[in-house]
Amino acid sequence: MNTSLFVRPEQRQAWQQLQTLAQAPAVHLRDLLPQPGRSHGLQYQAAGLSLDASHQRVNANILSALHALAEESQVLDKAQAMFRGEHINRTEDRAVLHVALRGRAQSTPPWGAEISQAVSAELTRYTAFAQALRHRQITGHTGEPITDVVNLGIGGSDLGPRMATEALWPSDDGFHPPPVQVHYVSNVDIWQLAKTLSALHPARTLFVVQSKTFTTQETLTLFASAKRWLVDGGCPADQCHQHLVAVTAKPALAQSLGFHAERCFHLWDWVGGRYSLWSAI
């Protein structure tokens, strides 16, 4: 697939056709809905989802132009290139394989068995850790179980997991809090971290430091402040690792900063921040 040339969508012939169709007099839905076969012809199913477009003001000409635009833009070819692991991220010269994180088990995945096996192994690791955390089996330096998790990260390392936590927070009956409280800090200004930690106890707090490269200055600053809080709260410096988890593409660098190997979960460099929710993030 040749990706060296980029043609803007509005420069394509199908786009011009769509613009012409958009300028046509609007047709009311009451005139479209009675058309024979409309409901069946505009219903689609894929990946467990059902889509009914029959109540949109589209017709055969519009659909044909949309399909033509997709073909002219080589959407399918580019999607297949992504699945094969080609470096379609031209800015960073990387693959874009977040789909491997959420792909179902396949005998011959387009991204290769090696990647699937690595993803499966990492999923098993961090799922087991999360389950142990929920069952109060993860302890701090005093032997007390961890009751609070503080997520340190910015961008996709904050927004995705924060959304999931808020969406899935209620227990089965909707009243009882989860066994472990999760807090998020993304502002390098010390006030947000200080406010969060003011209600927590160092012996029962675990920090999850999310950084693909461990070079993000904001995250490193928050991490340094968190370690200082642990030590000031009575945790021996050589025991801080019991209160630290790293999610990163650079586990060796994380370990050089004090994280233990078993508490480093892998985030591949082919996972973009906005898609990292499907990883250990």
Predicted regions and their residues:
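Expand to "…catalyze enediolate/carbanion chemistry for C-C bond making/breaking, isomerization
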Residues: N2
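Glycine-rich phosphate-binding loops that contact phosphosugars or nucleotide phosphates
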Residues: A128-R136, T142-I281
